[in-house]
């Protein structure tokens, strides 16, 4: 199936990027930690992908490197963790931060992620810690960033609304998302900056 895409970014609507390759536009759902690294619209980028088929939809998830994709695949194998929750986890933490939290059994850090309760956090620690033993090379080798241009930091009048919408898409309730963005909002910040700062503040 589709494992890698190289193309031109047509649109960026966190957490979805529209990537055109071969005359076809692919909607790719990305963790915000990966989304931050994307160049601006009109530039070329490469993403590693994982294709998920559901009864009501076919969704493509994208990552900047194979390590992030490997972790995503392992997350969705965990009981009670679907693609949407896995995306939220990797939006709140980088792949390495998540690995460290599991290895150190930092339950408090995990339950701060959207959709993660104590039982799910405990399950993640037990199941993922065991899997990491067999995935050490895949997760801990230096990641190679395949974004071809430096990221841009555009500003927008709708930055706060976009940030709230992205947080809701990641699993936060609308009121909670608005509160998170209002807490860190500033006039010169792009939506990506607001999302990143809101997620950091939540942790």
UniProtKB/Swiss-Prot annotation:
Domain II as annotated region, ranges: 65-142
UniProt xrefs under SUPFAM superfamilies: DNA helicase RuvA subunit, C-terminal domain, Nucleic acid-binding proteins, RuvA domain 2-like
Annotated region (Domain III), positions in chain: 155-203
Gene3D superfamilies linked: 5' to 3' exonuclease, C-terminal subdomain, DNA helicase RuvA subunit, C-terminal domain, Nucleic acid-binding proteins
GO cellular component: cytoplasm; Holliday junction helicase complex; Holliday junction resolvase complex
Domain of life according to the entry: Bacteria
Region (Domain I): 1-64
GO molecular function per UniProt: ATP binding; four-way junction DNA binding; four-way junction helicase activity
UniProt xrefs under InterPro entries: DNA_helicase_Holl-junc_RuvA_I, Hlx-hairpin-Hlx_DNA-bd_motif, NA-bd_OB-fold, RuvA, RuvA_2-like, RuvA_C, RuvA_C_sf
GO annotation terms (biological process): DNA recombination; DNA repair
Flexible linker: region residues: 143-154
Keyword Cytoplasm among record annotations: yes
Cell compartments where the protein resides: Cytoplasm
Keyword Transferase (UniProt): no
Domain-related comment: Has three domains with a flexible linker between the domains II and III and assumes an 'L' shape. Domain III is highly mobile and contacts RuvB.
Binding partners and assembly: Homotetramer. Forms an RuvA(8)-RuvB(12)-Holliday junction (HJ) complex. HJ DNA is sandwiched between 2 RuvA tetramers; dsDNA enters through RuvA and exits via RuvB. An RuvB hexamer assembles on each DNA strand where it exits the tetramer. Each RuvB hexamer is contacted by two RuvA subunits (via domain III) on 2 adjacent RuvB subunits; this complex drives branch migration. In the full resolvosome a probable DNA-RuvA(4)-RuvB(12)-RuvC(2) complex forms which resolves the HJ.
Stated name of the protein: Holliday junction branch migration complex subunit RuvA
Organism: Salmonella paratyphi B (strain ATCC BAA-1250 / SPB7)
Gene: ruvA
